[in-house]
C-alpha cells in the first residue's frame, strides 16, 4: 500500500499552486504538483486552467511526458504570453513498485530510500507556456518498502525571513533525510513547520505545497482536516 500526505498553504486566499491525486482505471495513481508564476487571482486562474487540462488529458494511455506535451500545447494557446507554470507529473504503478515522472521546469522532488539514500527528481523539460514545441522526458525508478517520494512547490525552499535570507533546499533535504520521520504525515508537517519558523512573522510571499508518498504495508484510508492524508492499497 501507500500513505499519502498533502500540506497546502496558499500565500493568499486563492492560490497559484495546484496539487492533485488521481486514481487511474488501471490501478495506477497519478500525482500532480503545479505552480503558476506569481500568486493571487491571476495565478489562481492559471491554476484552474491547468486543473481542467489535467482532468481532460488521457491519463491511462499517455506517459507523464506525453501528458505534459498535451497540456503544454493547450496551455500555450489558452494563456497570455507572460503566463508560465511548472508542473511535475508522477505515475505510480498499480503494484506500487515503479514510478515514472516528468517535470516541466518544476522544483526538485526527492526519492528517499529505506537505507537513507536520497535521489533528486530533476526537471525533464522547460516550463509550461513558453513554446508549443517544448519536449519532455520520462524518468523511471523502482520503489521498495519504506521508500518516500517528496514533491514540493518552490515556495517552500524559497521562503524568506525578515532579513531576506532564503530557507534553501538544504534545510528541506535535512528534514527528508532525518530517519525520525518514518511517516508521511510527520515529514510533510515538519517541512512546513521548518519553513514557517524560518519566515517567523514575515508575510508569506508564495504558496507552499508538499506532497509525500510512502510505500507501506497498510491498505486503509484515513482523512485529516488540515492536511489531506490517506493510505491507499
Enumerate the language-model features and the residues they cover.
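Divalent-cation-assisted or electrostatically stabilized phosphate/pyrophosphate-binding catalytic cores
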Residues: 165-180
Amino acid at each position: 500500500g501507500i500513505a499519502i500526505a498533502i500540506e497546502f498553504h496558499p500565500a493568499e486566499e486563492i492560490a497559484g499552486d495546484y496539487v492533485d491525486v488521481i486514481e487511474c482505471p488501471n490501478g495506477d495513481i497519478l500525482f500532480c504538483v503545479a505552480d503558476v508564476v506569481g500568486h493571487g487571482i491571476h495565478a489562481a486562474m492559471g491554476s484552474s486552467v491547468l486543473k481542467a487540462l489535467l482532468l481532460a488529458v488521457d491519463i491511462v494511455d499517455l506517459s507523464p511526458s506525453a501528458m505534459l506535451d498535451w497540456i503544454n500545447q493547450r496551455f500555450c494557446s489558452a494563456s497570455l504570453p507572460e503566463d508560465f507554470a511548472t508542473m511535475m507529473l508522477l505515475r505510480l504503478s498499480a503494484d506500487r513498485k515503479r514510478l515514472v515522472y516528468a517535470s516541466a521546469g518544476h522544483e526538485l522532488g526527492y526519492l528517499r530510500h529505506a537505507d537513507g539514500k536520497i535521489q533528486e527528481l530533476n526537471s525533464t523539460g522547460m516550463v509550461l507556456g513558453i513554446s508549443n514545441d517544448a519536449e519532455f522526458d520520462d524518468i523511471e525508478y523502482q520503489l521498495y518498502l519504506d521508500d518516500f517520494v517528496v514533491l514540493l512547490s518552490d515556495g517552500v525552499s524559497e521562503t524568506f525571513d525578515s532579513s531576506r535570507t532564503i530557507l534553501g533546499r538544504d534545510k528541506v533535504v535535512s528534514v527528508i533525510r532525518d530517519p525520525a520521520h518514518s511517516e508521511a504525515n510527520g515529514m510533510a508537517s515538519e517541512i512546513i513547520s521548518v519553513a514557517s519558523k524560518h519566515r517567523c512573522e514575515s508575510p508569506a510571499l508564495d504558496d507552499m505545497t508538499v506532497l509525500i508518498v510512502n510505500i507501506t504495508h497498510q491498505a486503509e484510508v484515513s482523512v485529516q482536516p488540515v492536511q489531506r492524508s490517506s493510505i491507499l492499497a
